[in-house]
Amino acid sequence: MTEISDDAKRNRVGWTKANADFTDKSARHTWAAEEITWGVFGVPEASLHTLGDVAGRDVVELGCGTAYVSAWLARRGAHPVGVDVTPAQLATARRCQNEFGIDFPLIEASAENVPLPSESFDLAVSEYGASIWCDPHFWIPEAHRLLRPGGRLWFLRNSTLATLCAADEGPPAETLQRSQRGLGRIEWPGEVSVEWQLPHGEMFRLLRRTGFVIVDLVELYPPDDAVDHCYYDTFSVEWSRKWPSEEIWVAEKTRGPQ
């Protein structure tokens, strides 16, 4: 395994616990899903069209967790590689690979330092993986390195507004709870894990400076039949119907970093 940061070590501890509490038990359900859906409330990709045709594409999933996204893409003809820093989640992913007969490489590494050759992939994806659990000043340039010219970066994260309204304790507020100025690295009270959330302007500048052009930014709202999540309860359906709690970014590699 490549060298990892102290924050990555903390997040590995946090996700080892989360895997024991929830993601190991939920993995079979997500692997079995026929439809691609995104985020806590399961917004169908068919209603968004953010991903495009993945058949024949080489895909790297950065912060893959139990690798259900890679499994979804493999069923659609992609050639995925999953990368994650948490051995427990990769063990769950391997068990699901054996059960469902879907095989692809799984690599234990931080998305900030991936032991794979440059320009090896057509698509890099992250649904609540590297997109919030890795330092974007490291993982986004690393995604750029891994992508071929014209390759796309796709990632889903919490919306900036949701982060600004998130209370340190209790349900989300309908008023701002923190300053946007200086928003970036976040340590929530009582949590071992470390999150990252750059405001939109800083994220735009980072992507452009790295050598990406922004293709799309989609704010997500729950489907009509959505219910509150049984485990990820930071934002309720009621709150998220009024304001987007999640967002998808799509960017294309056009040149080298500046």
Residue ranges of predicted features:
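Class I SAM-dependent methyltransferase SAM/SAH-binding core
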Residues: 57-113
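A short glycine-rich, Lys/Arg-flanked "PGG" loop and its adjoining helix->strand segment in the class I
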Residues: 137-152
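Short alpha-helix
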Residues: 194-217
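Conserved class I S-adenosyl-L-methionine
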Residues: 152-184
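N-terminal, positively charged/glycine-rich alpha-helical extensions of SAM-dependent methyltransferases
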Residues: 1-29
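Conserved alpha-helix/loop element of class I SAM-dependent methyltransferases that forms part
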Residues: 28-57
